Design a protein with these regions (language model features):
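Fe-S-dependent hydro-lyases/dehydratases of central metabolism
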Residues: 1-360
Length: 360
C-alpha cells in the first residue's frame, strides 16, 4: 500500500479533495476491497429517499422514495442485482457522465425470466448454480437482455447466494440478473448493519411497487422463460476454456482425458522445471495455481468458509502443496477475512501457504 500511495499520491489527493468539496461524493480508500463487494456490504440501500434534485429531503417534508440503481466500470457490477438493486457495468465515459449528473440511456430490453424450483442438494454451492446459469443462458442466447429470477425456488437461496449468481452476469451474456426483494434480502440488510428504519423502508416500498417476492401473486409476463430445478444442479468446474464450458466434478477425470485426446496431448510426456533450485517433473494436468479468490467466490461466505475448512483439515492431516503450486488468498473485502479469522480458519490457510495478497 505504501508503494501504491507513492505512485498515485496526486490522484488520491485529488479524490480526497473531491469528497470534501462536493455533496453526495464518497471515496473508498484503496485496499478496502473490490467495489461491488463493498457495495452490497455497505453502500447499497435498495430503496432511497431524496428530492428530485438529489438533495436530502428537509425534515418535515414528505420524501420521494425510489429504487436504488447502479452503474459501474467493473463488468461484475451486477452483483448488487442479488439484493434487488438494478445495475450493470458501463464504460468509463458513461460512468463519468453519470457521476456528473447526466442520464444513462439504454434501449428497452427483452426481459427473460428464470423460473427457479426445488432447492440445492447438500454440498452444492452458489457457484455451481452460476456455472449452470452460464451454460443454460449461453445456449438460450440472452445478450442484451435483462434476466429476472422468480419462482418457488427463490426461498431456498439466501442473499449472498443470489449475489454470487448475479455476479457472473457477464459470463451469461445478459445485462443483469435481477432478484426480487424478500425476507432473505431484509435479513442480509440487517446482518450488514442497515438501520431498522432503512429495512422497513425497503420492505414497504418493494411491496408497494410490486417488487416483493410474493408466492401468491400472479406470475409476471416475460419475453421468454427458462426453468431450472435447483435440485438438478451438480458440483461443477468451470472451463477448460470458458466458464460456460462446465464440467461436472464427478466427470472431471474422464473429461480431462477426453480433452487431452481431442487436443492431441501426450499424457505420458513430462518436463523437468527448476522451482527455487529444486528439479520438479511436471506433466499435463499439473496444478500450477491454487487460488482462494475471485469476487464471485468471496461474495458468498459459505464458499469461503468451505475453503477454510478444507485447508484446516488438510493442515491437520499434514498435507502440503507441491513446491510448484502458487497459493493465493484474495478475500473480496476485509469483512470476508474477518469472518475466516473469527471462525478460526485462517491458521489452516496460512499453514498451507495461503496468505492474503490483497482484497478484491
Amino acid at each position: 500500500m505504501e508503494l501504491e500511495f507513492q505512485r498515485n499520491g496526486e490522484r488520491y489527493n485529488f479524490l480526497k479533495w473531491a469528497q470534501e468539496s462536493f455533496q453526495n461524493v464518497r471515496i473508498v480508500p484503496p485496499g478496502a476491497g473490490i467495489c461491488h463487494q463493498l457495495n452490497i456490504e455497505q453502500f447499497a440501500q435498495v430503496a432511497m429517499t431524496s428530492t428530485a434534485a438529489g438533495v436530502e429531503t428537509p425534515e418535515g417534508e414528505n420524501p420521494t422514495v425510489y429504487f436504488d440503481t447502479l452503474v459501474g466500470t467493473d463488468s461484475h457490477t451486477p452483483t448488487a442485482n442479488g439484493i434487488g438493486v438494478l445495475g450493470w457495468g458501463v464504460g468509463g465515459i458513461e460512468a463519468e457522465a453519470a457521476a456528473l449528473g447526466q442520464p444513462i440511456t439504454t434501449l428497452v430490453p427483452k426481459v427473460v425470466g428464470v423460473r427457479l424450483t426445488g432447492e440445492l442438494s447438500e454440498g452444492v454451492a452458489a457457484m455451481d448454480v452460476a456455472l449452470t446459469f452460464a451454460k443454460m443462458l449461453r445456449e438460450k442466447g440472452v445478450v442484451g437482455c435483462f434476466v429476472e429470477c422468480f419462482g418457488p425456488g427463490l426461498d431456498s437461496l439466501n442473499a449472498t447466494q443470489r449475489t454470487c449468481i448475479s455476479n457472473m452476469t457477464p459470463e451469461y451474456g445478459s445485462t443483469c440478473t435481477l432478484f426480487p426483494v424478500d425476507d432473505q434480502t431484509l435479513a442480509y440488510l440487517r446482518l450488514t448493519g442497515r438501520s431498522e428504519q432503512q429495512v422497513a423502508l425497503v420492505e414497504q416500498y418493494a411491496k408497494a411497487q410490486g417488487f416483493w417476492n410474493d408466492p401468491q401473486a400472479p406470475e409476471r409476463v416475460y419475453s421468454d422463460v427458462v426453468e431450472l430445478d435447483l435440485s438438478s444442479v451438480k458440483r461443477s468446474i468451470a472451463g477448460p476454456s470458458r466458464p460456460h464450458d462446465r464440467i461436472f466434478l464427478e466427470q472431471a477425470q474422464e473429461r480431462f482425458h477426453e480433452i487431452c485426446a481431442d487436443r492431441g496431448l501426450d499424457l505420458g510426456k513430462k518436463e523437468t522445471v527448476d522451482v527455487n533450485g529444486r528439479a520438479c517433473e511436471l506433466g499435463h494436468g499439473a496444478l500450477a495455481i491454487a487460488a482462494v479468490t475471485s469476487c464471485t467466490t468471496a461474495t458468498d461466505p459459505s464458499m469461503m468458509l468451505t475453503a477454510g475448512l478444507v485447508a484446516k483439515k488438510a493442515a491437520e492431516a499434514g498435507l502440503k502443496p507441491k513446491p510448484w503450486v502458487k497459493c493465493i488468498l484474495a478475500p473480496g473485502s476485509h469483512a470476508t477475512e474477518l469472518l475466516l479469522e473469527r471462525a478460526g480458519l485462517m491458521d489452516g490457510l496460512r499453514d498451507l501457504g495461503f496468505y492474503t495478497c490483497g482484497f478484491g
